[in-house]
Amino acid sequence: MTNGAKLLIKWLKENVLNTYQEPVNSNASLPYISLSYVENEFASQTAQQLTIWTRSDSSYSEAYLYADKLSKLIGESGVLVKDNDLGTIVIYKGSPFCQNRLDDTTTIRAVLINLLITNYNN
């Protein structure tokens, strides 16, 4: 796993919800975020998609609570995330920022989050 992936996962775990790189271990407990990290050249912006997974029979409301929390953390200008060991990334909202994921099960509700990540790691 690259430092950019480690830094994004660490930041999401500390500020939003447990986060795992895909494939997620089958014993992970809902709710959580999953991602398949994408990294581009130094200082280039890359699209990154996250999935927020929750359990509910009928509502996406819990998933949207986490999406709202993430949206507030990122703000309208993005958020700079720095770590002495892992480097620096800047996270921006993608477009669309959030959308329902149509699920095959009646008890899992998930939303897709689109981000733009600028990676300043070598």
Feature roles, as predicted:
Residues 1-20, 26-29, 34-122:
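Charged, amphipathic alpha-helical segments and their flanking helix caps
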